């Protein structure tokens, strides 16, 4: 049969999805299944690894069945995944020794403090590009080895394997034949030296983690093994892996220095490609690994906005100012500006570049003339201002000129927000026709690895832009608006 399709497995924090793409990068079929979130203690978050596998394997089968596609028509399968989430299982049986500890889980805070006390904070920053934080996998591994009976002894005997979610899925899809990850996922473990592109022995020793547990690191655009769907049909190559944010960066074809993307979700995730330079940030951004045009390792700066779409949820659920998130564009467009109102949504503190956990949300500039429309508009503008804060930090750190800003995520449907983002950053904002850029990135990597597509140049003809948002305000107005935002931020921190 002719190979007509590539499938992306998109394993997220709350659901597993499979998306089928054709040769023109159009979505042919989507299947999704949510799975259980486990909260055994305050600040702890877990998933059942077997439920992750069951949900992911079922949507793979379902996505093909829905479109009437035979598995022999599939050229390759790519994987993208929630990063940092940690799974340890028995090599002989494939049985997890503990639930997956999710990236959000804070249980290993004390281990991080111990490493700081040992003077490892700067070493971690320099060699992994990360902060010493429970967010990342390394301290989660140590917690499991320290707290699950016999786990450390088994690990030292070579009986246990570690993997992030990509590695777990690859292991299951190949029936235990392949124990592999890619550099984008390895770079989120706190154990991977992003300069030598190898596991860091100093950090493995500090955390007492046996190297034999760790997966082999292979390129993101590579064939790792094969699988059969439901045990039927021919063997399908498993051929591309990238963590979710790096997959989105590649799906947006941000493969050259100075190219950046912003994913607008509950928060916002911004990544800027810095090419072959691993730039150490002086603004609290993370240095991470990305994928280049030939599938080679590139580097990127990464930063996140805590409150993006969550700010709009607050307008809806706590204030009752809107019924649906889509209402915000209508109300914001009813007024010419915010009438001097600024909302700083520091509900859980401020992230990069401020890193102030004690800041709290506030509305500034309220007068008797301020109304609901002004507050709603200020909420939308706050998302763009926070994104500009990060983009400005990336530009200063990297020395790169921002060429354009590619965007994806739910909020990109809001034309007002996208136009204001272009206005306040003074760069063109590009919204793609296919907004499933995370899955598209995994599909692109898989397709390139098997020759389904030949080059990034070919992909540029597939990844169409739905709308260009060009800056539409002058420099003096831009400066006045942003100075007002910066003043408001200062006051939330005082």
Swiss-Prot record:
Key words of the record: ATP-binding, Glycerol metabolism, Kinase, Nucleotide-binding, Transferase
InterPro entries per the UniProt record, alphabetical: ATPase_NBD, Carb_kinase_FGGY, Carb_kinase_FGGY_CS, FGGY_C, FGGY_N, Glycerol_kin
One family name in Pfam for this protein: FGGY_C
Binding site for ATP: 13-15, 266, 309, 313, 410
EC category: transferase
PROSITE patterns in the cross-refs: FGGY_KINASES_1, FGGY_KINASES_2
Family (UniProt): Belongs to the FGGY kinase family.
Name this polypeptide is given: Glycerol kinase
